[in-house]
Amino acid sequence: MSTAFVRRGANLLVTGGLAGVVVWIGARYGLLSWVAFIAWVACVFSGATGSAAAVALFAMLAGALSGCLVGWLTQPFTHVLGQFSLPLVLCLTVGLIALLEELPSMGLVPVYFLGMIAYFASGMPPGAAALVNIAIPAVLGIACGLLCPVARNWLEKRADLLLR
């Protein structure tokens, strides 16, 4: 068997296995499994190292908090601005997040938007419950993003030893 076949097989087993575990945990505990997959992508996008994953988790949760703030700020401005309150508040929030790209430590602007998307897609009202319902599967997804390359490398080495 070729090395490429072993690598693809290890990737299939590890990534597919972890994805199955995420879905099972989500169904078992009523978590938003799709948030874990978004966080997993954010972890891989950030480089899948411990410090980069921590920054990705922070950015994703900050994005979810930004989504909550949009929900909170839209309500009082609706009385004054009517149907234009949501677009204006969202425009200001997204614009401020986009400006973060200029700061070297805040370069994961797309991950902020992934967190905001996770909040809006959850359909939950703004509040702590929404943030907790996003934070728990986000941590699970970041853990999968960190574990996947480690487990894949471990499995590839074991397979290479068996095939020699």
Which residues make up each language-model segment?
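Alpha-helical membrane-inserting segments
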Residues: 18-26, 66-77, 96-100, 121-122, ...
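Internal alpha-helical transmembrane segments of multi-pass membrane proteins
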Residues: 77-112, 164
